[in-house]
């Protein structure tokens, strides 16, 4: 017998209309075997409104500039305010990016993201000009590849330039419920600066990839608050990360979320965003371990493959086989 909150949530499957905030909070209190019923509903909603296996979204990223970031994000190994042991380097060469992008194409990945550490760019600097050149070269030499970017907070001029250079998606995460950003993530910039960047991107018709990170000390209600806040941003992709505690950061001793809590979060995200690509990013392999397959049957229709900015991921070939096996559940 279905839990009444899940039974009520089946209207999302029938109508395609998302949960209300109150309904999402009710589902957030579920536990035990009810979570499998919730996952089943989320999977059905994903298949009906966000496409089947053929629309599964896999992407790879490259850390093109690493470390020495002046922002004090509490979870991040690249912040100079933290003491994580990572490789530090300035912006890499165009050739280095091209090699990584070619490998992504060879692996059958359709989207490739260039990522840089740092606050962002309020104007077009010489470094930003180099990034634009990288984008142009990838378009020229790998025309089948969707080139994406994540360069931090952007002003009007850099956003307009990215639009002119044909960027496919721009990633900038909200991370947590906006009114908790300075408490849980960073004090050197605000959630409002990120939201302003998203609005600029959408004004220039750039598709936005924006999600967050769970397990950083937020309450269950605040976790739902993040998912609700994302509804107002007109997003193409929602990547959700599960905190991977990194030594040398303020969150290194954080208690990891249970697989059940992660499952519940992703399933509720699908019911709040029936038509959006929902991507499992960091934490899929390291935090979910044996349960990551279950997550992919709980409304998720995309993942990051081949590794993250400062942590390793699973082999792309293994992920391709994994994605193909999901077709059995469509």
Swiss-Prot record:
Organism, scientific name: Chlorobium chlorochromatii (strain CaD3)
Function: Catalyzes the conversion of dethiobiotin (DTB) to biotin by the insertion of a sulfur atom into dethiobiotin via a radical-based mechanism.
Transmembrane spans: none
A molecular-function term among this protein's GO annotations: iron ion binding
SUPFAM superfamilies linked to this entry: Radical SAM enzymes
List of residues binding [4Fe-4S] cluster: 69, 73, 76
Keyword S-adenosyl-L-methionine: yes
Cofactor(s) this protein cannot do without: [4Fe-4S] cluster; [2Fe-2S] cluster
Annotated catalysed reactions: (4R,5S)-dethiobiotin + (sulfur carrier)-SH + 2 reduced [2Fe-2S]-[ferredoxin] + 2 S-adenosyl-L-methionine = (sulfur carrier)-H + biotin + 2 5'-deoxyadenosine + 2 L-methionine + 2 oxidized [2Fe-2S]-[ferredoxin]
Pathway per the UniProt entry: Cofactor biosynthesis; biotin biosynthesis; biotin from 7,8-diaminononanoate: step 2/2
Name of the protein described by the UniProt record: Biotin synthase
Cofactor info, note text: Binds 1 [4Fe-4S] cluster. The cluster is coordinated with 3 cysteines and an exchangeable S-adenosyl-L-methionine.
Enzyme class: transferase
Family note: Belongs to the radical SAM superfamily. Biotin synthase family.
Binding positions ([2Fe-2S] cluster): 148, 209, 279
Keyword Transferase attributed: yes
Residues of the Radical SAM core domain: 51-284
């Amino acid at each position: 017998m279905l839990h009444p909150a899940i039974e009520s949530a089946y209207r999302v499957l029938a109508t395609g209309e998302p949960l209300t905030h109150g309904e999402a909070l009710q589902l957030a209190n579920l536990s035990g075997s009810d979570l499998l019923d919730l996952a089943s509903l989320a999977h059905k909603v994903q298949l009906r409104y966000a496409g089947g296996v053929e629309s599964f979204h896999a992407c790879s990223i490259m850390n093109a500039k690493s470390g020495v970031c002046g922002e004090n994000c509490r979870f991040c190994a690249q912040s100079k305010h933290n003491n994580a042991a990572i490789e530090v380097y300035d912006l890499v060469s165009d050739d280095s990016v091209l090699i990584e992008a070619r490998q992504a194409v060879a692996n059958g990945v359709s989207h490739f993201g260039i990522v840089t550490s740092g606050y962002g760019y309020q104007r077009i600097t010489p470094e930003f000009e180099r990034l634009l050149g990288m984008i142009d070269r990838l378009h020229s030499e790998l025309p089948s590849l969707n080139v994406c970017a994540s360069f931090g907070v952007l002003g009007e001029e850099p956003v307009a330039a990215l639009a002119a250079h044909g960027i496919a998606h721009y990633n900038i995460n909200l991370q947590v419920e906006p009114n908790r950003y300075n408490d849980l993530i960073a004090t050197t910039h605000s959630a409002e600066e990120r939201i302003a960047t998203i609005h600029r991107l959408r004004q220039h018709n750039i598709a936005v990839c924006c999600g967050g990170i769970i397990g950083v000390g937020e309450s269950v209600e605040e976790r739902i608050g993040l998912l609700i806040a994302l509804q107002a941003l007109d997003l193409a992709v929602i990547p959700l990360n599960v905190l991977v505690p990194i030594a040398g950061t303020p969150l290194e001793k954080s208690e990891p979320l249970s697989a059940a809590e992660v499952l519940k979060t992703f399933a509720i995200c699908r019911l709040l965003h029936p038509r959006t690509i929902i991507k499992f990013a960091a934490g899929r392999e390291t935090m979910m371990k044996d349960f990551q397959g279950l997550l992919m049957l709980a409304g998720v229709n995309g993942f990051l493959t081949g590794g993250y900015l400062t942590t390793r991921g699973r082999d792309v070939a293994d992920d391709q086989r994994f994605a193909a096996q999901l077709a059995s559940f469509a």
